Amino acid sequence: MMEKINKQVAFLFSSSILFIAVSLLFVSCGQAGKAHTDTPTSGVTTIGSDDSYTPTVNAEIQVFQALYKAAAIHVKYEPEDSLFKGLMKDSLQVIVAGRKLTTQEETYFKDKQLFPEQVKIATDAIAILVNNDNPDTMLTMDKIKAIFNGDSTWDSPGKGKITVVFDHENSGNSRYIRENLMKGSKFPTYCFALNSNPQVIDYVSKNKGALGIIGVNWVSNDYDSATVGFLNKAKVVYVSLTNGGQHFQPYQYYIKTGDYPLCRDVYMIKTEPYMGLGSGFLSFVTSDKGQRIIFHEGILPATVPTHIISF
């Protein structure tokens, strides 16, 4: 009887070894030509980010690389549309964007047996800028919606026509406006795109009738000399959710309370199928240290307290 049991155990053991060996063979075949030399804290990788989050992403990378000397993270700052295309083409495996994957995109990855990790890292806001000489610094949501649906005149007498400028035609900023204020319709002819958030700030500073749309991260850290320079070039508009209601600027605190109406969540999305440098960087950004960097940058971190920064 014992001999029979021993033979059964031996058979099960040898079968398990065979199964593991075959599984490893399939994995190695699937990874053929994809030898990975990076680890969560070393090596070289390239991630993608919407230009709206450049200050925060740069700050995160600077601290991460200071902690892990063997790590080098490069960034492609691209329009949101290009980031998701890169993710689907596998030219990018980690991105920072103002939206999650769509159902169609999730299905695409599922069909490829990939299950992306989508992690909320922060909440930021759309900031509206006007020229320093423009007295119209308080707008209602009704007025903002009207501007993007054909009303091209400033309320103040003598201010003339409005010109609206974005960072990029396919950026997260322009998508947010289309989806939330325009019901997906096309931009009016007096709206046009530049190539970056700093270009928007510069344009507004030189054109009295301009209204600029940027990610608030570019003007949210008043400890940063570049931010102070931007804030000297243009004014950040106060926005009221209702007519006759209180107006708020996109301070970190008012993003948290929801009093400032033009807010959105920020996500890191990872398709990296192994524990590489992209995975390590995502873990860092979501850690206490990484979240405190976001806090310091003036947008709302997912997990730590907030304060008011005066523009």
How would you label these PLM feature ranges?
Residues 29-69, 73-76, 80-81, 85-88, ...:
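Exported/periplasmic ABC-transporter solute-binding proteins
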Residues 1-46, 311:
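Bacterial Sec-dependent N-terminal signal peptides
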Residues 81-112, 222:
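Pocket-flanking alpha-helical
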Residues 113-117:
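Periplasmic N-terminal soluble interaction domains immediately after the signal peptide in Gram-negative
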